[in-house]
């Protein structure tokens, strides 16, 4: 990620790493690539971002993750939209890169389809050049620093869905959020099944907590998908009861012996 950020077509920007007690030589790698390394005492992404943001003095802030492959024109394609004063924040879709495994690309479906994510799609690609949207995932988005300061940055202590809550705060303050469908960020997915299922469990849990505190980020589809496990159990029970009621047997009688 740092290597590709260092080769961007946009000439002047600062790369900042908020390092929360990592054990993988993050400091050495960051300094090697000319990034600003901050030793962060936080224990979650929201607080880590706030720790870094409060030490920054820039007009625009771009966010991405350490498991992405930033296109070399990503910064340039993102910041150009802020020439329009109506743009409070802008982002783009993200998909599994071409070199990811078949299993990871299957997992990509869970992030990029409306049905599987209750309407919150990481891979949303609406038609148009710059399209209004209610949320951009934190892996590929940018905000005006003035707006971030106005809403007091991320919600402190938010253990998940912090990017969703931030976008809600930004819009509550009267600012508009857009998506550039062409500005795609390749984003590696966790491999099925155990790592991916753990991630999905955590997403569901944290989104449920966020929905209760910020009702405006919840939609009917979030509530509906919560009934999915009950529907599955009810379907299985109905099938079993139906088989019992119909005297179904795996070993049907062959009739009386002659």
Segments (PLM) and residue ranges:
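Basic/Trp-rich segment in TM-proximal cytosolic loops or flexible interdomain/linker regions
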Residues: 193-257
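A recurrent flexible, glycine/aromatic-enriched loop bordering the glycosyltransferase active site
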Residues: 117-142, 158-159, 165, 185, ...
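Glycine-rich, basic loop-to-helix element that forms the pyrophosphate-binding segment
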Residues: 29-32, 40-56, 77, 131
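Short aromatic/hydrophobic "clamp" motif used to bind/position activated sugar donors
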Residues: 61
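Short, acidic, metal-binding catalytic loop of nucleotide-sugar glycosyltransferases
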Residues: 3-12
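Catalytic donor/gating beta->alpha subdomain of glycosyltransferases that bind UDP-sugars
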Residues: 82, 98, 149, 155-218
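A conserved acidic beta->alpha catalytic loop
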Residues: 19-27, 68-69
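Conserved donor NDP-sugar-binding/catalytic core segment of glycosyltransferases
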Residues: 72-105, 109
């Amino acid at each position: 990620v740092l290597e590709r950020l260092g080769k961007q077509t946009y000439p002047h920007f600062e790369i900042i790493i908020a390092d929360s007690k990592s054990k993988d030589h993050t400091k050495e790698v960051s300094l090697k690539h000319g990034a600003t390394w901050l030793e962060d005492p936080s224990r979650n992404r929201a607080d880590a971002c706030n720790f870094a943001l409060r030490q920054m003095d820039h007009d625009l802030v771009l966010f991405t993750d350490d498991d992405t492959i930033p296109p070399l024109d990503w910064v340039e394609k993102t910041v150009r939209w802020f020439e329009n004063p109506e743009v409070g924040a802008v982002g783009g879709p993200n998909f599994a890169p071409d070199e990811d495994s078949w299993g990871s690309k299957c997992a990509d479906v869970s992030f990029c389809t409306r049905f599987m994510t209750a309407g919150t799609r990481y891979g949303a690609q609406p038609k148009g050049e710059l399209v209004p949207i209610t949320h951009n995932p934190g892996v590929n988005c940018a905000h005006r620093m003035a707006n971030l300061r106005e809403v007091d940055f991320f919600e402190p202590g938010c253990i998940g869905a912090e990017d969703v809550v931030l976008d809600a705060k930004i819009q509550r303050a009267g600012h508009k959020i857009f998506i550039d469908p062409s500005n795609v960020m390749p984003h590696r997915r966790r491999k099925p099944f155990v790592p991916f299922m753990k991630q999905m469990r955590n997403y569901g849990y944290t989104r449920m907590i966020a929905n209760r505190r910020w009702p405006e980020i919840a939609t009917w589809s979030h509530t509906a998908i919560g009934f999915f496990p009950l529907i599955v159990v009810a379907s299985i029970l109905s099938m079993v009861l139906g088989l019992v009621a119909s005297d179904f047997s795996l070993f049907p009688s062959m009739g009386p012996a002659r």
